[in-house]
């Protein structure tokens, strides 16, 4: 596996010097300063590449070239946004960058209710509390029809939860959900959020799939011609929320994507934390089934709670993900590719990390503090090395 590290650009509290000291060789980043839908120019791409090269690092994966909301809803200037996306892919390829992660989640990227969930050891994790989210939908956002998504018992629990909240807690929960987490390119006020949700009225699962299919048919041929590996990120959490459809949550969704545009350049970011939230997702089977289309991996573990729709982020080698089996499957695919002549390892990054030790005293991007990810990367590296030394000696020699 190629060991990479997510970096949010010059304003990231974690510096490129820190990244090198963590042992990563590749960087996963994006041009966050360019508005969604606009072309990434060769000049801007080369500028970012030069920043990384000056620190002895390479730009391994783009995460992400954002998909404009008008592409997802097929409204406004969506065809122009697609044309701009195509040109950004060509420009990235011209600059030698060949792996692009993206997602097709409506309105919000990843969603959490608590960004400072305190674990028994005193470190902090990200959490999605289903009842807290219900309280937001039913009593803060007051989304029409939201009650249809919750049982009577969940509605009662949400009402109790909301009644016990202070104004400060209401503001914090609202901000956690709609203000934009790291990697999200847009944040909203409550009124803006309601308006954005309304843009999806009449767009169900089938319609959003149709729109994704159109997008794929437009961009995959460009990716093929340019030598770009597209890697769609799964929904997080992997189920419908806020009355919005989700189209990349299960093995059936992966199968649909492959069949819709059957090209090796139409692939996946295999995020164990996102897919792993669902107990009915067999991660190893999913990975092995679509191994040849996995172009990028996010390795982290989540812990499902008593309410199966609630979860928090666990340590990388704990929780509901069998990380040893996952890395074993990744290495098996790398060996297959190596024998077929493709010697490039699959880029991997330690996804998220607990806020811990000295980082508890610092301002950090939620989920992206340095020390927790450093710990995760070291653990994942150890698993990989042990497997290479025992089961994948050919890769070790390679």
From Swiss-Prot:
It catalyses: D-mannonate = 2-dehydro-3-deoxy-D-gluconate + H2O. The keyword Lyase applies. GO terms for molecular function: ferrous iron binding; manganese ion binding; mannonate dehydratase activity. Residues 342-362 are annotated as: Disordered. HAMAP family: UxuA. Pathway: Carbohydrate metabolism; pentose and glucuronate interconversion. InterPro entries: Man_deHydtase (IPR004628), Xyl_isomerase-like_sf (IPR036237). Catalyzes the dehydration of D-mannonate. Its cofactor is Fe(2+); Mn(2+). Its EC number is 4.2.1.8. This is Mannonate dehydratase. Belongs to the mannonate dehydratase family. Keywords: Iron, Lyase, Manganese. The keyword Ligase does not apply. The lineage of its organism: Bacteria, Pseudomonadati, Pseudomonadota, Gammaproteobacteria, Enterobacterales. It comes from Pectobacterium carotovorum subsp. carotovorum (strain PC1). GO terms for biological process: D-glucuronate catabolic process. Gene3D superfamilies: Divalent-metal-dependent TIM barrel enzymes.
């Amino acid at each position: 596996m190629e060991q990479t590290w997510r970096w949010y650009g010059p304003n990231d509290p974690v510096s490129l010097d820190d990244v090198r000291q963590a042992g990563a060789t590749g960087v996963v980043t994006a041009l966050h300063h360019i508005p969604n839908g606009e072309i990434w120019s060769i000049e801007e791409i080369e500028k970012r590449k030069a920043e990384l090269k000056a620190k002895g690092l390479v730009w391994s994966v783009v995460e992400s070239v954002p998909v404009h909301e008008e592409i997802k809803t097929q409204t406004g200037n969506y065809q122009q946004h697609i044309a701009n996306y195509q040109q950004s892919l060509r420009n990235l390829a011209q600059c030698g960058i060949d792996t692009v992660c993206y997602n097709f989640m409506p309105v919000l990227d990843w969603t959490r209710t608590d960004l400072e969930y305190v674990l028994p050891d005193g470190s902090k994790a990200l959490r999605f509390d289903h009842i807290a989210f219900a309280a937001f939908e039913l009593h803060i956002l007051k989304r029409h029809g939201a009650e249809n998504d919750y049982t009577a018992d969940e509605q009662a629990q949400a009402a109790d939860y909301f009644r016990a909240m202070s104004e400060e807690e209401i503001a914090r929960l609202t901000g956690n959900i709609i203000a934009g987490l790291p990697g999200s390119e847009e944040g909203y006020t409550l009124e803006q959020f309601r308006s954005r949700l309304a843009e999806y009225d009449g767009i169900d699962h089938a319609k959003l799939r149709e729109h994704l299919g159109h997008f794929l048919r437009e961009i995959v041929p460009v990716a093929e011609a340019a030598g770009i590996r597209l890697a769609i990120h799964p929904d997080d959490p992997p189920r419908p929320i806020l009355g919005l459809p989700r189209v990349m949550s299960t093995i059936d969704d992966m199968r649909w994507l492959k069949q819709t545009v059957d090209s090796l350049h139409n692939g996946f970011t295999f995020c164990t934390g996102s897919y792993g939230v669902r107990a009915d997702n067999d991660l190893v089977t999913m990975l092995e089934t679509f191994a040849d289309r996995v172009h990028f991996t996010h390795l982290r573990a989540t812990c499902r709670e008593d309410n199966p729709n609630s979860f928090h982020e666990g340590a990388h080698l704990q929780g509901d993900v069998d990380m040893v089996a996952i890395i074993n499957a990744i290495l098996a695919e790398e060996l297959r590719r190596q024998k077929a002549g493709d010697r490039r390892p699959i880029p991997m990054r330690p996804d998220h990390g607990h806020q811990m030790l000295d980082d508890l005293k610092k301002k950090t991007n939620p989920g992206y503090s340095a020390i927790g990810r450093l710990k995760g990367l070291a653990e994942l590296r150890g698993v990989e090395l042990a497997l290479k030394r025992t089961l994948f000696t050919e890769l070790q020699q390679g």
